[in-house]
């Protein structure tokens, strides 16, 4: 069984506190985009086999797809195993939920293969044990995600909007970025209510004005390349530009495909991983 595993971007990301166990409390607007990996799963007699077209992708428990399969098999006492083939298109360690969406897609395919009676709610319970972005990736679309990622409220779909996405030639550790964030020193928070209202009113310019990611407080100081990319996007006609997740991917939001194509061509001269895509 073959399925697409779609990436996401954050239209906003706010950190509003920290739990005693160290987890950060989040308030973020998440959006699925039409950039995807391909996941194919076949039933085998025993075990979990991962294969991927990128050699640097781990094929053991470090891979969230493996972890998803293992949790599913254990939870439902399934004696069979699975072979998972991954074709990677989503950049790795990029703030685009590449690993999380692969894991979510594995859970959905395994439901189809083994237990079609399982609800999305139940799948999301398993997903939360894998990572904060995985529950959102089960549903996709446009949603407000709160807590540690488990509280998901769908909103009006912000679909068919044009994005140009740049992933610079380095990766960032989500854990390191959050560990370097000083929550008490976040002085400007996203106006998430205004952002949602802008989406509901189809006001693209207002959406662009209200996009904000507080993790940029950490990354923009340390990585000047990210400042340059954001500035370049605005110079090349983007309505707004923001880092997605914990980075380092940065996207520009456009209202015109010709401008987006010119921007893509310009960025492609400087960076290897550049994409034109749309929200879905």
From Swiss-Prot:
Q: Which InterPro entries match?
A: GHMP_kinase_C_dom, GHMP_kinase_C_sf, GHMP_kinase_N_dom, IspE, Ribosomal_Su5_D2-typ_SF, Ribsml_uS5_D2-typ_fold_subgr
The EC number(s) given in the record are 2.7.1.148
Q: Where does ATP bind?
A: 91-101
Known catalytic reactions: 4-CDP-2-C-methyl-D-erythritol + ATP = 4-CDP-2-C-methyl-D-erythritol 2-phosphate + ADP + H(+)
Q: Does the keyword Nucleotide-binding apply?
A: yes
What's its top-level EC category? transferase
Q: Name one GO molecular function term.
A: 4-(cytidine 5'-diphospho)-2-C-methyl-D-erythritol kinase activity
- The residue ranges crossing the membrane are none
Which pathway does the database say it acts in?
Isoprenoid biosynthesis; isopentenyl diphosphate biosynthesis via DXP pathway; isopentenyl diphosphate from 1-deoxy-D-xylulose 5-phosphate: step 3/6
Give the record's keywords alphabetically: ATP-binding, Isoprene biosynthesis, Kinase, Nucleotide-binding, Transferase
**What are the positions of the active site?**
8, 133
Q: Which residues form a coiled coil?
A: none
Offer one example of a GO biological process linked to this entry: isopentenyl diphosphate biosynthetic process, methylerythritol 4-phosphate pathway
Which family does this protein fall into?
Answer: Belongs to the GHMP kinase family. IspE subfamily.
The name of this protein is: 4-diphosphocytidyl-2-C-methyl-D-erythritol kinase
Organism annotation: Clostridium botulinum (strain Loch Maree / Type A3)
């Amino acid at each position: 069984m073959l399925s697409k595993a779609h990436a996401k971007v954050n239209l906003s990301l706010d950190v509003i506190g920290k739990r005693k166990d160290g987890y950060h409390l989040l308030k973020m607007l998440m959006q699925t985009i039409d950039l995807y990996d391909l996941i194919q799963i076949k039933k085998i007699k025993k075990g979990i086999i991962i294969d991927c077209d990128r050699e640097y992708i781990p094929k053991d428990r470090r891979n969230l797809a493996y972890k998803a399969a293992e949790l599913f098999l254990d939870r439902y006492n399934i004696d069979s195993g699975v072979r998972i083939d991954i074709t990677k298109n989503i950049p790795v360690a990029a703030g685009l939920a590449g690993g999380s969406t692969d894991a979510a897609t594995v859970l959905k395919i395994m439901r189809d293969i083994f237990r079609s009676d399982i609800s999305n709610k139940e799948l999301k319970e398993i997903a939360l044990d894998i990572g904060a972005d995985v529950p959102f990736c089960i549903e996709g679309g446009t949603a407000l995600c709160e807590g540690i990622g488990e509280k998901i409220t769908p909103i009006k779909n912000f679909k068919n909007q044009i994005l140009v996405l740049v992933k610079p030639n380095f990766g960032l550790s989500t854990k390191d970025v959050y560990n370097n964030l000083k929550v008490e020193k976040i002085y400007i928070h996203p106006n998430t209510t205004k952002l949602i209202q802008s989406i509901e009113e189809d006001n693209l310019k207002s959406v662009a004005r209200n996009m904000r990611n507080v993790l940029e407080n950490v990354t923009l100081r340390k990585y000047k390349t990210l400042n340059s990319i954001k500035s370049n996007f605005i110079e090349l006609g983007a309505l707004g530009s923001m880092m997605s997740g914990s980075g380092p991917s940065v996207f520009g939001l456009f209202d015109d495909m010709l401008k987006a194509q010119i921007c893509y061509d310009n960025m492609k001269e400087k960076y290897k991983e550049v994409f034109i895509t749309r929200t879905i």
